[in-house]
Amino acid sequence: MSWLKGIIAYPETVKTLDWFRAKGYKLGVISDTSPSLRLTIKQAGLDEYFDSYTCSAFAGVDKPDPKIFNMALESLGVSAAESLYVDDYYVEADGARNMGFTAFHIIRDGYDKGYEGERKWDIYSLYEMAEYAGRENT
């Protein structure tokens, strides 16, 4: 597992997670991956932030199947309507939005994966999601 040594978080990740934690948000990860997800997050130094890990290997489906989103919601005891979601794939962000999440598509390094749909929910930094949450809760 030497590939784990190269995993680092984006620069704004820790500050954004700290902000959400300080505001009392429950935080979870939904990923199309195996149970090694937790090890990956730990290697990035982020494991202390998350209350829930939902991976496709246990869900039996990949995003954007509603089942994986529902498993994550259930694990946190929240509804989609009170949840924020961010993904670097449009189709997965759209899947969450179709279920009632406020869902953002994050574009990293200018790469937008050729999406042709609505661009209203595009962000370029996790700070933008925190700014949105701050505005909505004032």
Model regions and ranges:
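Asp-based, Mg2+/Mn2+-dependent phosphohydrolase catalytic module
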Residues: V14, D18, G28, S34-T138
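Switch/coupling loops of ABC transporter nucleotide-binding domains
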Residues: Y25
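Conserved ATPase "switch" residues in P-loop NTPase domains
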Residues: R21
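Metal-dependent phosphoesterase signature
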Residues: M1-P11
